[in-house]
A protein has these predicted regions:
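RecB-family 4Fe-4S metal-dependent nuclease core
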Residues: 1-167
């Protein structure tokens, strides 16, 4: 498989570049794997997936990785793939995103996040009940979590789950 092939070792694990100097927005992220396609002097971005659930086709993860690879290293991006480790023996190739469209989408979201931070107004698009990704964080911010560990980079909180009701 691709892991036995040549790969690109980037100078830094965490890639970043100015998405918009005018808006003071930097795009950053970490690529799982960059396979080197020697015969065409290009790269293949592989994103390892540990979940059994397939990635949403509208996810911006691969477009973000594409922008990072395009702007943080010199070789063209020839291929993008998800590799679902639970059930695939090889990566599943995805379409290359349009660079301009990807940049515009990411920039639009970056501007919204920047404005929300400035106004301290973090409204979840899923309404007052929040979403799977922010419910626990919101509970911690309301003081409902118990801090159980602290390090220079992370704080760990325990949040008790609501017990399901029986009908």
């Amino acid at each position: 498989g691709p892991l036995a092939n040549l790969s690109i070792k980037l100078k830094q694990d965490f890639l970043y570049y100015w998405l918009s100097e005018e808006d003071n927005l930097i795009l950053c992220g970490k690529l799982d794997w960059l396979e080197y396609l020697k015969e065409i002097e290009a790269v293949h971005i592989i994103d390892f997936k540990t979940s059994k659930k397939e990635e949403n086709p509208t996810s911006l993860q691969l477009p973000i990785y594409y922008l990072l690879a395009k702007n943080c290293q010199s070789r063209p991006v020839e291929k993008l793939s998800y590799w679902y480790l639970e059930y695939d023996t090889m990566p599943t190739r995805q379409d290359l995103p349009d660079e301009t469209e990807s940049k515009n989408k990411v920039l639009e979201i970056g501007r919204k996040i920047k404005l929300a931070r400035k106004l301290e107004n973090f409204n979840c698009p899923n309404g007052k009940d929040g979403c799977l990704y922010c419910r626990d964080l919101e509970r911690v911010s309301r003081g409902e979590g118990e801090k159980v560990s602290e390090s220079s980079r992370h704080d760990l909180y325990f949040v008790e789950r609501d017990k399901p009701t029986e009908d």
